[in-house]
Amino acid sequence: MDQLAQTEKYSPFRFFSAEQWSRFRADTPLTLSEDEFRRLRSLNDPVDLEEVKRIYLSLSRLLSAHVEASQLLFRQRQAFFNAVDIVKTPFIIGIAGSVAVGKSTTARVLKELLARWPSSPKVDLITTDGFLLPNEVLRRENLMERKGFPDSYDVGALLRFLSGIKSALPDVRAPVYSHLTYDVIPGEFVTIDRPDILIFEGINVLQPGKLPQDGKIVPFLSDFFDFAIYIDADEKLIHEWYISRFMRLRETAFRNPDSFFHRYSQLSEEAARAIAEGLWSNINLKNLRENILPTRARADLILRKGADHLVEEVALRKL
């Protein structure tokens, strides 16, 4: 985060080492067991319960404070409008960052920690994968090699979904994506029914659109977020994690004959690694540099990872 921390005096962020951040846990209890955490962890992600204690319990405590403040503001607005029939809207947490940086593990761990607060809030988790355009459309538009780039998503559907959630509508539907077939599953949806908290995870969720010249209101996804988190790491580390994950998948999920990537499991290790390097260089690295990393400074909190996926530094936006 060198560019963000050049002079903290003029930065919109406060910076903490992992050790400093861990002290903010206070008396927040660890409510996850080793077995539960193991089920939440993504493939090739070595994060353990010690990291949850060190980083995520403090983050859970911080988010609890933000949710509590949001609820207080809601009650004050009710009084301001002299209205009691206004429906409380969900608190939305956006999580962004590169492919292979550990967003999914972070999102799942936070979901479990937040749901176990004493108030027992209803917490749901949605990823942007289901909002990718179907492969048939991507092929027709010559976008298959830009899958994951902003133009490969159904932005209208994303905005309608988040608008429905923020409007406290019941039974808002999100499409479902299959990592086995590498495609949206036709006609399959997950229903989100007025959660207290929604975690919305995806590589480009902090991506702003082009500002209209005529001043019309054009919402960005992040306009619906109450708190945004960016998972950060050095480019070289993300590259290592991506290649390592690809090679692990080659030995596991890719061996399924129904897998979109099954053909890669038939290649030699050298050939498979060359494919992975090409996918990284031509697609994922390009997307990171052009679209994902530039959104980092739009987050409220940045978790900067070092080796072994362990957080080394935390940046929190000043109030």
From Swiss-Prot:
Known pathway: Cofactor biosynthesis; coenzyme A biosynthesis; CoA from (R)-pantothenate: step 1/5
Location within or outside the cell: Cytoplasm
Keywords (A to Z) from UniProt: ATP-binding, Coenzyme A biosynthesis, Cytoplasm, Kinase, Nucleotide-binding, Transferase
Catalysed transformations (reactions): (R)-pantothenate + ATP = (R)-4'-phosphopantothenate + ADP + H(+)
InterPro entries (alphabetical): P-loop_NTPase (IPR027417), PanK (IPR004566), PRK/URK (IPR006083)
Any one biological process term the GO annotation gives: coenzyme A biosynthetic process
Entries under Pfam families matching the protein: PRK
Protein's name according to its UniProt entry: Pantothenate kinase
